Amino acid sequence: MPEKPYDHIAIELKWHERWQDAQFYKAEENSAKPKFYVLEMLPYPSGTLHIGHIRNYSIGDALARYKWMRGFNVLHPMGWDAFGLPAENAAIANKVPPRQWTLQNIAAMKKTHRRFAFSYDWDREVSTCEPEYYRWNQWFFLRMLERGLAYRKRALVNWCPKCATVLANEQVVDGCCWRHEGTPVEQRALDQWFLKITDYADQLLDEMARLEGGWPERVLTMQRNWIGRSEGAEIDFTLAGAGTPIRVFTTRVDTIYGATSVILAPEHPLNETLLDSEKKAKAKAMVDSRAGRDPGDIDKEGFFTGHYAVNPYNGEQVPIWIANFVLMGYGTGAIMAVPAHDERDFEFCTKYGIPITPVIRPVDQPAGEPVALPYGEYGILENSGEWSGLASAEARRQMSAYAEQHGFGKSAITFRIKDWGISRQRYWGTPIPVIHCPSCGVVPVPDDQLPVVLPDRIEITGAGRSPLENVPEFVNVACPKCGEPARRETDTMDTFVDSSWYFYRYCDPHNSERPFDPAKIAYWFEIDQYIGGIEHAILHLIYSRFFTKVMRDIGLISNNEPARRLFTQGMVIAEGAKMSKSKGNVVGADLLADKFGADTARMFVLSNVPPEKEVDWREEGAEGTYRFLGRVYRFTTRNVPAQQRSGDADRKVVRKLHQTLKKITEDFETRWHFNTCIASIMELVNLLYAEEQNISAAVMPQILESLALMLAPFAPYLSQEMWEEIGKEGPVFRQAWPAFDPELAKEEGAEIVVQVNGKVRTRITAPFGTAKEELESRSLAHEKVKPFIDGKQVMKIITVPDKLVNIVVK
């Protein structure tokens, strides 16, 4: 048959239309097949897909298609993380309701998803902005409220005076509002709802052992640091002259004789009595100046309160300071500064002239010799009363016990992680299902009144508190307990609540009686492969682990973790630079599909580097991928039906075919180096072109069939077209994955590298186990070697059997 040109537009349109209503990607319930749940993190519906999205989804799709071909029952769903601030901003800018803007974006993105033939089971689609979904956010909140895991307290929040509203931490840039550059963000105290994630801090940390080997070590390290478990002691200094205790937390009680000051957080409750009005204003300015910033990134500043504290171990008085780097949310909000043995304290105390007293020396350093400061390691105590001469570890144990015996301290564990503040003064989020009654206080909305639905008619201006406060029919309700007039909560939930459990809903997306059927979760969970960016390591991936443990304790599920394996894909950059709208270098998915086709885009983002590495989008690279797909298609079409040819190359191409199958199979099962999978297919195609006239009619059909099957995970449109061209029926990715034969994949002989003075000059093939003398003789006589040794003295020959001959001459 004459070869056909590769018309990606015609091929992809043809199969796109045929697949529209097909149910190829439906997961089966209660199947006897082994299950495989593969999931890419659900996207925010921004309206358009770019090449970065395509890479993420192509990784998951390749794996899903491969697992189908290996006989698995595959669950591969997709949904939308649809609540969030961008929709409110669009409503303000364009006078479009957030719901309308969101649904338009979902429709546009879903159309592109379908265009790229990602194998999603769309019957399981969820959108977190639908009442059918966020009803269960509210249900989970009420269960946590019952268990004491949800509570309300007054807390400091970021406040922009120009916006007249609360900002999330991510909306604070260098201490200023993201909308109003140069406008410092203030800290205000507001009543906020929290989820008690700290109750699960130990579990979140300890149960990471189950994830080792399945999750990237970098993610686990980030989570360990974020949870930040510290073992130490809480010690009560006392306010000189008053006896009021000032409890400090320290991990190094062995250094307490070197404490030369006590430092309080600027919002510490004791400041109300310690500070005059001028110093209170100073402390408040400190709080405002660090709003939304990492304390480690700010210049350390402080001031003396004018008061002193008494060290309970030696009775000495030390000054009490206020400093911006001490956090109320960590430990007790008060620290003892030991500048001789802590780098941060050393920097601060040196700046303000606070004394420095060494009390620890290195184990291998004689007593009396000066210590290079700050010395932060363990060592031997000195100048520490009765504990002088003890090693740090033993001193910590004895000194903690002494504090407990004498009633001024105890051993303690503290965590860096704080309870999760979920209140947002926004419209486009899940309403928090409580009612505030003057008589009954905080009253949960009864389950049979869920969902509390967002009102459709609302004006969003971006000013003031929650827009919901301006909707009387939403706010004004009867108390469920006493029936008297009451007010509905107007805060909405952090959108991370939505994404903390969505993967469970995929297993039972249409259940109107409960979040999901536990039996379905028992079948599908844990997620076998979760895929998403490293940027989610310490928010979504911690919150989802927390939700899983709470659901386990409620009795809904039995698994301890949401995902068995996690993969974090690399970023896509464009022409060497990070893609951004401001640079104008965002590569849109639809434009790529128009120019090169969906298959080319999918293949390119997988073909250059391993998927965990950054990939650089370059148009010439996409053109190369497009040419390769064209070569494959033309080779297929001109060899159907197979021609009667010599068959001289049959053994060679069959061997290469089975080597390629072996390579791809092993990569899918282990390291996911899709780039080397695709490279091996390219090598096979190069050989097929070179030996085309020497492949028999008996072997060619096997080659073409295997080629279509190997391409199926990477290029679904082209592989399906090839499958039809060779006379096969049914979806190609539902065929059995071709098995490789280890015997057929074996080389008939070894390839020997021949070098002269360490430089490769040629390669020869010889039967395995060929004697070194014969290898050397053949190498010396080779036409490509002789020009480099003629007229020269052979000093020695280094031979590695089956691998190398290196001729050393001078």
UniProtKB/Swiss-Prot annotation:
Organism superkingdom: Bacteria
Motif window: 'HIGH' region: 43-53
Chief site of localization: cytoplasm
Motif residue range(s): 'KMSKS' region: 578-582
A Pfam family this chain is assigned to: Anticodon_1
UniProt keyword Aminoacyl-tRNA synthetase, yes or no: yes
GO biological process: leucyl-tRNA aminoacylation
Root EC class: ligase
Residues noted as binding ATP in the record, renumbered to the chain: K581
Subcellular location: Cytoplasm
EC number: 6.1.1.4
InterPro entries associated with the record: aa-tRNA-synth_I_CS (IPR001412), aa-tRNA-synth_Ia (IPR002300), Leu-tRNA-ligase (IPR002302), Leu_tRNA-synth_edit (IPR025709), M/V/L/I-tRNA-synth_anticd-bd (IPR013155), Methionyl/Leucyl_tRNA_Synth (IPR015413), Rossmann-like_a/b/a_fold (IPR014729), tRNAsynth_Ia_anticodon-bd (IPR009080)
Key words of the record: Aminoacyl-tRNA synthetase, ATP-binding, Cytoplasm, Ligase, Nucleotide-binding, Protein biosynthesis
Family: Belongs to the class-I aminoacyl-tRNA synthetase family.
HAMAP family the record matches: Leu_tRNA_synth_B
Name recorded for this polypeptide: Leucine--tRNA ligase
Protein source organism: Solibacter usitatus (strain Ellin6076)
This protein's encoding gene: leuS
